[in-house]
Structure formats: structure tokens, C-alpha cells
Amino acid sequence: MDKKTAVSLLVAASLLAGCAAKPDQAQASSAVDSQINDPFEGFNRTMWKFNYDVLDPYILRPLAVGWSNTPKPITSGIRNVLSNLDEPASAVNYLLQGQPKEAIVHFNRFWINSTFGLLGLVDVAGAAGMQKENQREFGHVLGHYGVGFGPYVMVPGYGSFTPRQDIGGLVDSTYVPLALITPWGSVAKWALEGIDSRADALDKDALLRNSPDSYILFRDAYFQNQNFIVSGGRAPTTENPNAKELNDVIDEID
């Protein structure tokens, strides 16, 4: 389960909580439903069942529990290093969206933390008041310019993805310093980010388990989350009635 999938688990739980308080949720989410392209739903449900019923409880969740019990200075330091590696890609992607202010923040955070923060281990820039902007992936840039998701796919271990977001991820991997990381280093980064995000979702497990259709909830949360990010957190409430909940969840990850 990758970071995006773990984040979607958090968002799904948030949406489930919102649904309990909003009987008209189905009508309010129609705009998101119209964007969902799930031609492989039968296959995806099988993969979801394997990921959720086998890989998560026997592999990912135990790792996440261990991670959550690791001393905070260690997990925070690792999280800072991994996040620092993504700063240049976010800077470029914000520039591509015509948002130079956010791009400059990401660029400055990268060189300051890389130089004075032990290659990002310590968030010196954040301590100086330069708070991190939301990460921007090239897939989000494509969404910003109206490119559709493409078909939704769920695979064992890797989790959920769409062509737009994964093609965007390939583009992001060409930016320095991500382009300098070895294949095994990239796998380690991906795994650590997934475990870290899964640890953040541990207290949401019961909500997802209690859903009448966890696959649909999780899938819809994926699209809600991506749309919320692309909109810069400014999605109209008619399209995203859980905007505050989503923002709170995303803030947990950031």
C-alpha cells in the first residue's frame, strides 16, 4: 500500500464520519461520482480484498504499529528527510501552475534544510517560520489543466492508482534530487512513506471496517482527495461537503 493509498484510507474514514452526519451525502457527491472511471471494478474489488484483508493486517499494519511506537525524534527526522527530497519537484510543479510564490517557498525550504538541517533531517526552515506548502505532484498539475484521471486500478501491494497520477509520478522522478536516487533507494522511500502514512491512519481503522462497502468508500475517497488537492483546498462545498474534514486529514499527513 503506497502513500496515496494510505492517505485515501484516512480520507475514507473522514468521509464515513461525514456521511453519518449528512443524509444527503450521495446527492452532494454526484460531481465526484461523474469523474470516477472504474472499468475494472470486479478485478479491483478482488485486489482490494487481498490488500485490505491480507496484506494490511498481516504486514502493513504491524509495521505501522511498530513505527508509531518508535521514538518521535527518529520518525520525525526520517519524515523530514523524505519530505525534503520532494521539495524541488513541488517547486517546479507550482511554477508550471503559475504559482511562483509557492514555488519559491519549496525551493527555499529545500536549500535551507539541505544546508543547515543535515540534509533535511531537521526542519530548520519551518522553525524559522517558513512553513511547508502542500506537496504538488505533476499529476496534480495535469489535473489543474483539466486532464482526466483515466481508469482507476487497484493492484496487490502497490495499492490504487490512475494513469494521470502515476505518469505524473514518473515525471516527478526525473527532477533532482529524486533522479539521483537509486532504484532501491526509491523503493525504500516509497515503503517508508507508506508505513508512515498508514501509522497516521491507525485510529481510523474501525470507521472503515464499519462501512457497508469499504471498496466504494475507499475508491471515492481517492478521487475526493485528489480533487481536493488539485483545487488547492478550495473545492466548492456543493462538490465537496467534507472539505474541512479532508483538509484536517491532509494536514495530518503534511
Predicted region positions:
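Post-signal peptide N-terminal segment of mature Sec-exported envelope proteins
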Residues: 27-54
